[in-house]
């Protein structure tokens, strides 16, 4: 009898390891943390860790997840040993309760990292085709093993940010021709073709695509008031017209603009397939407390860096 009791207790203890928050919900936090959370690196990331622990997400997607600048300066780190991230994400994630860490997309010094309470694995890193397509910062496709056995496909990305195309010979002329918008659109098409485009049943499966798209959406044009054929909309027009993805924030806040950057744009998106959207119970852009971003008063002297980031986090929950 005693042995049976021990086995029952052990079973429930093991089950709790796979419990997904209150009421069985899975909480997902996305954030572009600007230069590897440069703001808090001199503080051993204590404020950052405390903020994440308070939110208690089950899955995190971090963009710009690499240390790049010396604390409180706009001076780039020169030696890899000076960079705490991305090499030590496992140690940092453990401080807010995550046991699994993956560098999902990385082609340069602006990687995307996933951390999770649940097992995860890389499926594909998307950097280009070696010919005429380059994904400047890289993108990635990972799978998270959810409680109960379901798989969540996670696509992370950070598209090219400039007005001119990557490697443009005449940057000024290319910017005038909207080369940056067109380059981002090619990146987006290639990323989708290499990820969700490989799954004929994607709309019936759990897919999430999130990141810094560096592009605004025509669904927010009630705010931007641009011509609908403006090249600024090319990236999200492609997603909306060629994939089953649903813009979560748009659906939860119809007609209500939700900025995700200090500059006042919404360029950080959470896209999910219909199968996942049906399970989403809440979604929001976080702009209070530690996430209340502002520009460093030193301005251009410090590259217009912000504290703690120039982007706001996006948080959503779903029930598997």
Residue spans of the language-model regions?
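Active-site-proximal beta-strand elements of phosphoester/diester hydrolases
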Residues: 25-38, 124-126, 151-161, 177
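Catalytic metal-binding/acid-base residues of hydrolase active sites
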Residues: 32-34, 66, 158-160, 213-216, ...
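Metal-dependent phosphoester-hydrolase catalytic domains
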Residues: 197-208, 214-320
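A solvent-exposed, charged loop/short amphipathic helix patch at secondary-structure junctions
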Residues: 164-182
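N-terminal, active-site-proximal structural segment of metallo-dependent hydrolase catalytic domains
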Residues: 3, 18-95, 107-109, 310, ...
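Structured beta-strand-rich core segments of catalytic domains in phosphoester-bond hydrolases
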Residues: 63-162
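His/acidic metal-ligating clusters that form di-metal
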Residues: 151-153, 179-214
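Bacterial N-terminal signal peptides
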Residues: 6-16
């Amino acid at each position: 009898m005693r042995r049976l009791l021990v086995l029952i207790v052990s079973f429930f203890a093991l089950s709790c390891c796979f419990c997904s928050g209150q009421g069985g919900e899975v909480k997902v936090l996305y954030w572009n943390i600007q230069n590897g959370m440069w703001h808090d690196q001199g503080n051993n990331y204590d404020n950052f860790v405390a903020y994440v622990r308070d939110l208690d997400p089950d899955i995190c997607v971090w963009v710009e997840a690499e240390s790049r600048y010396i604390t409180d300066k706009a001076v780039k780190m020169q030696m890899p040993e000076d960079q705490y991230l991305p090499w030590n994400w496992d140690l940092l994630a453990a401080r807010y309760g995550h046991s699994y860490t993956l560098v999902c997309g990385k082609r340069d010094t602006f990687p995307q990292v996933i951390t999770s309470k649940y097992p995860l694995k890389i499926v594909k890193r998307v950097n280009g085709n070696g010919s005429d397509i380059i994904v400047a910062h890289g993108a990635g496709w990972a799978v998270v093993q959810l409680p109960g056995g379901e798989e969540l496909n996670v696509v992370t990305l950070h598209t090219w940010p400039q007005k001119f195309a990557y490697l443009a010979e005449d940057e000024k002329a290319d910017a005038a021709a909207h080369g940056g918008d067109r380059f981002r659109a090619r990146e987006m098409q290639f990323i989708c073709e290499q990820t969700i485009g490989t799954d004929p049943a994607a709309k019936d499966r759990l897919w999430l695509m999130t990141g810094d798209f560096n592009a605004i959406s025509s669904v927010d044009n009630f705010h931007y008031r641009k011509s609908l054929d403006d090249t600024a909309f090319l990236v999200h027009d492609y997603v909306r017209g060629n994939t089953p993805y649903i813009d979560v924030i748009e659906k939860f806040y119809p007609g209500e603009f939700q900025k995700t950057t200090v500059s006042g744009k919404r360029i950080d998106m959470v896209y999910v397939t219909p199968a996942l959207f049906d399970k989403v119970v809440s979604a929001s852009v976080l702009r209070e407390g530690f996430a209340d971003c502002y520009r460093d008063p030193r301005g251009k002297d410090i590259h217009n860096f912000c504290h703690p980031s120039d982007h706001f986090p996006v948080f959503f929950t779903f029930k598997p």
